[in-house]
Design a protein with these regions (language model features):
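N-terminal active-site beta-alpha-beta segment that forms phosphate/nucleotide-binding
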Residues: 1-112
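Redox-cofactor binding/interface segments in oxidoreductases and associated redox assembly factors
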Residues: 49-51, 119-120, 177
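Surface-exposed, charge/polar-rich loops and edge strands
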Residues: 1-3, 7-10, 14-18, 104, ...
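Short glycine-rich anion-binding loops that position phosphate/pyrophosphate groups of nucleotides
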Residues: 52-55, 122-126
Length: 194
């Protein structure tokens, strides 16, 4: 592991947990609005979301808005013995392995069906880098689904100039903050407007 990753991750998680509730709510609302305006979201049929941990952005308004548009929303489930997450429908959400609600087994969809991953992260950088919680689930999952678009979202304070990266770290294609939408060309996934 890169020597700066662990202390940086710990600092970002602590900072995220300390974000005032009103700032988190306002930021989440702005990010949902900006995300719903993206042409890639308008064209998507299947989108993954996540159940937020303390201090993470609220995704329920995005989930409800996407479902109202007829988009299938999937949520991650940890699969014992695998780093690749399974994604299933929300109608069977229940407490899971990491203490986060996840879909019951049997509601999974193939990774190849997913158009867009909305990925969580403790921090992102200005070149499409993402830092997660360190377990590697999203890096393994994104590597297994290279054709799907990857969108990160964070408060502006968690967008850093640069994050330490290793070979297994998977980049994102777009980043949405309350004030900006950043587009990254490293994977060549975006043609036309995002």
């Amino acid at each position: 592991m890169h020597p700066f990753k662990r202390p940086l991750r710990a600092r970002l998680i602590a900072e995220r947990r300390a974000v005032p509730t009103d700032e988190l709510a306002a930021g989440s609302e702005a990010i949902v609005r900006r995300t719903l305006e993206l042409p890639v979201i308008a064209a998507a049929k299947v989108v993954t979301l996540y159940q937020p941990m303390k201090g993470e952005l609220a995704v329920e308004p995005l989930w409800r808005a996407l479902e109202a548009r007829g988009v299938t929303c999937l949520f991650p489930r940890v699969v014992k013995g695998s780093k690749v997450l399974a994604f299933g429908t929300a109608d069977s959400l229940r407490p899971g392995v990491l203490g986060i609600h996840e879909p019951a087994p049997g509601s999974e969809r193939a990774l190849s069906e997913i158009d867009v991953f909305i990925v969580p992260g403790v921090g992102f950088d200005e070149s499409g880098g993402r830092m997660g919680h360190g377990a590697g689930y999203y890096d393994a999952t994104l590597a297994a689904a290279p054709r799907a678009l990857r969108i990160g979202a964070c408060l502006d304070r968690f967008l850093l100039p640069e994050l330490p990266r290793e070979g297994h770290d998977q980049p994102i294609d777009l980043l949405v903050t309350p004030t900006r939408t950043l587009r990254f060309e490293s994977r060549g996934m975006l043609e036309g407007p995002a």
